[in-house]
Amino acid sequence: GGEIADIVMVHTGLSTEVLKESISQIRDGEAIAGKTAGATQVWAFAKCNISDDRDEAIDEIKMALAASGHHAFRFTLDGKHVPEELRESIAILQREYLPVEHEQLGHTRNAALSDELNLTDYLADRFAVVGTPDECREKVRSIEAAGVDMLLITAIGPNPSEIIRRFGEEVIGPTK
């Protein structure tokens, strides 16, 4: 990434460990190309939902969490910081994920998979900025502290414009 790009979009996960690993690989690419360290902007991509109730916020985006898990772990789990105890569940997600239902809102098979496989909390923590305004602010701060230059969110839920409004007013505004 860093050897050829000016900006790299990262969707490998939002934990500090995963972000630092991704950024390290980008910086290695910069060094190979003779670029100044930090010349490549790092953007992170996150599924987002905000609510006064964390469980409600997560419930509304389970299908998107399953989609992120399906995408990120499609070819291998090697080097992807997946806990050993979740590897079999991730393998089942890969086999049973239904592309025809990709990110459809509501009670879909893909939404149910994350709960059935006990992956919901892991996928939410890894791929989303989701929960109460306080929880979302904390997550945004940790993403920034890991070295990310820009956070791109996709508002997922029954009312995306309300998610964007609340995110701007209750998460981004207070973090400045």
Which role does the model predict for each range below?
Residues G2-E30:
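Loop-centered beta-sheet repeat module
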Residues G13, F45-N49, I156:
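Active-site beta-loop-alpha junctions enriched in small/polar residues
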